[in-house]
From Swiss-Prot:
Alphabetized InterPro entries for the sequence: KH_dom-like_a/b, RbfA, RbfA_dom_sf
Family: Belongs to the RbfA family.
Native species: Chlamydia caviae (strain ATCC VR-813 / DSM 19441 / 03DC25 / GPIC)
GO biological process, one term: maturation of SSU-rRNA
Broad class of the protein's primary localization: cytoplasm
Keyword terms, alphabetized: Cytoplasm, Ribosome biogenesis
Function: One of several proteins that assist in the late maturation steps of the functional core of the 30S ribosomal subunit. Associates with free 30S ribosomal subunits (but not with 30S subunits that are part of 70S ribosomes or polysomes). Required for efficient processing of 16S rRNA. May interact with the 5'-terminal helix region of 16S rRNA.
PANTHER family: RIBOSOME-BINDING FACTOR A, CHLOROPLASTIC-RELATED
Places the protein is found: Cytoplasm
NCBIfam families, sorted: rbfA
Keyword Cytoplasm: yes
Name by which UniProt lists this protein: Ribosome-binding factor A
């Protein structure tokens, strides 16, 4: 139980630290001009690997291009984030897209169809 609580706490700290690094320190053109939100971090039980889920609102690049740039910058992001979160071993980070807008779009489409049916 204590280990589970510790992992949740470290997940929260990592999410905040990684988000700050992406916002303030990463100068990659495919990252710095995008709206990127770190939605959650899932740390492995051995604390050596972390899956970082991001939501990307494309502006100049596609989400896939931005995700590739994040993956390429993962080492730098981990290095900078490790300065803010002190752990014996800083986890290797892996980025994944979490499409939080897709369910919202689906619901809006359903509501629009219902409104259209009510008009007829």
């Amino acid at each position: 139980m204590t280990e589970n609580r510790r992992i949740k706490k470290v997940n929260s700290l990592l999410r905040e630290a990684i988000a700050n690094v992406i916002l303030k320190d990463v100068k990659h053109p495919k990252i710095s001009n995008q709206w990127i939100t770190v939605t959650r971090v899932c740390l492995s039980k051995d604390l050596h690997s972390a899956r970082v889920y991001v939501s990307i609102m494309p502006h100049e690049n596609t989400s896939a291009e931005t995700l590739d740039a994040l993956k390429a910058s993962a080492g730098f992001i981990a290095y900078k984030a490790s300065k803010g979160v002190v752990l014996k071993y800083f986890p290797e980070i892996h980025f994944y897209i979490e499409d939080i807008f897709s369910p919202q779009d689906h619901i809006e489409n359903l509501l629009w169809k219902i409104r259209e049916q009510d008009k007829n």
